[in-house]
A protein has these predicted regions:
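Flexible, glycine-rich active-site loops centered on histidine and acidic residues
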Residues: 130-136, 157
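Short Gly/Pro-enriched turn/cap motifs at secondary-structure boundaries
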Residues: 163-166, 190-193, 207-209, 234-241
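Flexible, small-/acidic-enriched active-site or ligand-binding loops
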Residues: 170-172, 223-253
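Long, acidic (Asp/Glu-rich), low-complexity accessory segments flanking structured domains
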Residues: 249-267
C-alpha cells in the first residue's frame, strides 16, 4: 500500500516537473521558433557594437584616474547622454532610443568590460529610474521627466536606509500630507548616482501603522531641497558615487506621487527584478573584462621553457572560467528575453544575479593570480576588477536574498 502511494506521488511530481519545464521553455508567440540566446536583432547588434566602441575610446582612457580620484568624470556622463545610452528603452516620443531591454543589458555588459563604475551608473538610470517612469508614472510626469532623463538629467533610486537593507520595507522616511503637497523627512543610505543626480525616486511611508502598504514612491527634484551628504569611500566601483541623502521637510507636490499612494512596495518589488538582470549583466561584463585582460599574457610569458598557458593545470583553470562566464551570460540573456516576452522572470533574474556575481569573483581572482605580481599592481585593471566584483553579491539584493527568492518560487512551483 505504502509503495503504491509513493509511486503515485512520484508520478504526480514528475508530471508537475514536466509541466514546469514546458511552461519555461515553450515557444513564445513573440519570438516564433526558438533560437540561440545570442540571436540579436540588427538594432541590438548595432547597440552592442556602438557601446563597445564608446567604452574603448571614451571610457577606457579615464578609468584609472576616475578610480584614484573616486569621482565620475563629468565628460563620461555627458558622453553617455550624447551617445543615447541614458534612454535606451525610453520611447522615441520622449527622446529615447525605444530599444529592447536586451539592448540595455548589452550596453551594461559592454561598459562593465571596461569599467563597472560607468556600467552601474548607466544601469541604475536605465533599468530602475527610467523603467519606473515608463511603467508607473502618470502621463504628466512622463512628459516632464522622461525627455530630461534621456538627454541631460541623471536619476537615482532612493530605497535603502540604515535600518532597511535586505529588509527593504522597514522604512523610517516619512511623507506627511499637507494640502497639495507631501513633506518628506528622513535619510537614505547607499544611494548610487546620488552625487551627480538631478532626479530622485524616493520611497517613503505615509503611515507607519500601515506597514508596507503605506510605502509610496515620490519624484523629487534636487532643487526641492534634497541634501546629498556623506559620500562613502568604497572598496570598489569607486568612481560611482554612493552617498547618504537627507530629506529635511522637503516639500513635494502631491502630483509627484508615482502610481498610487501606498503602492510603492509593489513598484520596488517589481522593478528590482529588472535591476537584478542589469547587475547580472554588469558582473558578466566584469568577468569577461578580467578574462580578456589576463588571457593574452598566458601565451606571452614563458616559465620552465613553456608558455604559461600551455601547462595543463593552467588550461583547466581558464577553460573552467570560460565555461562559468558563458553560463552566467546565458542565464542573464534568458532572464532579459523572458522579461521582454512579459513572462515571469523573477526566479531567472535572481539566478542570473546570484551566479554572475559568483562568477565575477572567481574570474577576477583567477585573473589576478594568472598574471602573478603584475596582476597585483595598479598598472593593470585586474586589481580593480577584483575590488569591483564584490559589490555584485551585495547591492540590489544580497546573494542570500537571491537564494531565498529562488527557494520561495521553487517551493511554490512544486507544491501547487
Amino acid at each position: 500500500m505504502m509503495r503504491s502511494v509513493l509511486a503515485s506521488a512520484a508520478r504526480t511530481t514528475c508530471a508537475r516537473s514536466t509541466r514546469l519545464l514546458r511552461a519555461q521553455f515553450s515557444t513564445s508567440k513573440h519570438t516564433g521558433a526558438p533560437g540561440s540566446l545570442y540571436s540579436l536583432s540588427e538594432e541590438e547588434a548595432m547597440m552592442r557594437d556602438m557601446v563597445t566602441q564608446f567604452a574603448r575610446t571614451t571610457v577606457q582612457p579615464k578609468v584609472l584616474s576616475m578610480d584614484e580620484q573616486e569621482k565620475m568624470d563629468p565628460s563620461i556622463i555627458r558622453g553617455l547622454f550624447d551617445a543615447g545610452l541614458m534612454g535606451i528603452e525610453t520611447p522615441a516620443d520622449f527622446g529615447g532610443a525605444e530599444a529592447s531591454f536586451t539592448s540595455a543589458i548589452l550596453a551594461i555588459e559592454e561598459l562593465a568590460r571596461i569599467d563597472p563604475s560607468v556600467s552601474v551608473l548607466c544601469d541604475v538610470h536605465n533599468t530602475l529610474v527610467n523603467t519606473v517612469f515608463r511603467t508607473y508614472a502618470s502621463r504628466e510626469l512622463q512628459e516632464e521627466y522622461l525627455p530630461k532623463l534621456a538627454t541631460n538629467k541623471l536619476g537615482c533610486f532612493c530605497l535603502s536606509e540604515a535600518g532597511a537593507g535586505s529588509d527593504a520595507f522597514a522604512l523610517q522616511t516619512r511623507a506627511r500630507r499637507d494640502g497639495d503637497e507631501y513633506v518628506l523627512d528622513g535619510t537614505k543610505m547607499w544611494i548610487t548616482n546620488s552625487a551627480e543626480a538631478d532626479v530622485f525616486l524616493v520611497f517613503a511611508t505615509v503611515d507607519p501603522a500601515l506597514g508596507y502598504r503605506g510605502i509610496t514612491c515620490f519624484v523629487v527634484d534636487r532643487s526641492m531641497g534634497v541634501k546629498v551628504a556623506k559620500k562613502e569611500r568604497k572598496l570598489g566601483i569607486r568612481a560611482s558615487s554612493t552617498c547618504q541623502v537627507e530629506f529635511d521637510s522637503v516639500r513635494v507636490p502631491a502630483s509627484n506621487v508615482v502610481g498610487e499612494v501606498g503602492r510603492g512596495y509593489k513598484i520596488a518589488i517589481e522593478i528590482l527584478n529588472e535591476g537584478r538582470v542589469g547587475i547580472a549583466a554588469q558582473m558578466v561584463g566584469l568577468a569577461q573584462g578580467a578574462f580578456d585582460c589576463a588571457m593574452p599574457y598566458l601565451f606571452q610569458r614563458k616559465q620552465f621553457g613553456s608558455r604559461v598557458g600551455d601547462f595543463q593545470a593552467m588550461q583547466h583553470q581558464y577553460a573552467q572560467i570560460a565555461v562559468d562566464i558563458e553560463a552566467a551570460r546565458l542565464l542573464t540573456y534568458n532572464a532579459a528575453r523572458l522579461k521582454e516576452e512579459q513572462r515571469p522572470f523573477a526566479k531567472q533574474a535572481a539566478m542570473a544575479k546570484l551566479y554572475a556575481s559568483q562568477v565575477a569573483e572567481r574570474a577576477s581572482s583567477r585573473a589576478v593570480e594568472w598574471m602573478g605580481g603584475l596582476g597585483f599592481t595598479r598598472e593593470l585593471p585586474l586589481e580593480k576588477f577584483y575590488r569591483d566584483c564584490k559589490i555584485g553579491a551585495i547591492y540590489e539584493g544580497t546573494s542570500n536574498i537571491q537564494l531565498q527568492t529562488i527557494a520561495k518560487i521553487l517551493a511554490k512551483e512544486y507544491q501547487d
